[in-house]
Amino acid sequence: MLERAGICAGVVLFGSMATHAQITPPSTLNRTVNLNYVYAAELGFGGYSLAGLTAQVYTLPLDYTVHDVLHDGWALRILAPVQLGLYSLKVTDTNGERISIDQQSVALMPGAELEIPAGKRTVFKPFAQFGVGHTFGVDAGSPNFYVFLAGARAVSQWHAGVTTISLGDAIIFAGDSPIGSGFSEHYVSLQLGLEVRHPLGFRVGSLAPDLGVYTIYYYYPVPLAFSRFLEPELKIVNQGEIGFSIGSATQFRWLGLSNPRIGAGFIFGGGLTVLRINFGFHL
């Protein structure tokens, strides 16, 4: 059965909640599948499949920015993302029995990010989030959990004509635990990324559409861990991501959002591949 043991930060992913799927037939082989919700929480909006487990996370990225907080030029982003996770485990046991388990989760991940200019090109962004969630679909273990993310990001920008080049890095500590007894987890992520944006050469009204392409390297000194039914635990130390986003080189607002972007990314390496929707270069 699926038992709550972890947490989620978005969905999958990457999020992550610590719910887990627990299959109980007696054997020396692994029959406990822990849903890595804390990875889902960081992932935000995407999904992956691994050893019979399919995970999908959908995040409504609500936030509000207050300008000139604590100091002129500083900004405070109030974060209130709402995350929905959909998980499906379909595996076959050693005796040929087919096992199918579905579970859902909902989490609220409030937090704050302080944007501190450091010179003309760089913005330093310490942040913290702490949220709670609830799982549905399996009547086992604690259905409630908490998840946390904390760390700092920094991004620097240069302009070469109409081209914008961004270099970003981040350090993130993330974890989750059930409210009550059960499985908990955490990991540390070091990230380094590069994005190049360039206008597409035409206008739509006042908008000047542009295309951004990016790459990000992930290093986990405390590895990502994914349990697998009847298989050894998968531990990931290195991953890469490539992706793109579309937006406008001119300033605009849409549905209350300032200069929104949307795109897609592909995360690979360490035995896990992930597809995600992004809302711009996320470092």
Question: Residues of each region from the PLM?
Answer:
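Extracellular loop and loop/strand-boundary signature of outer-membrane beta-barrel proteins
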Residues: 47-50, 94-100, 136-142, 177-185, ...
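Outer membrane beta-barrel transmembrane domains
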Residues: 86-100, 201-283
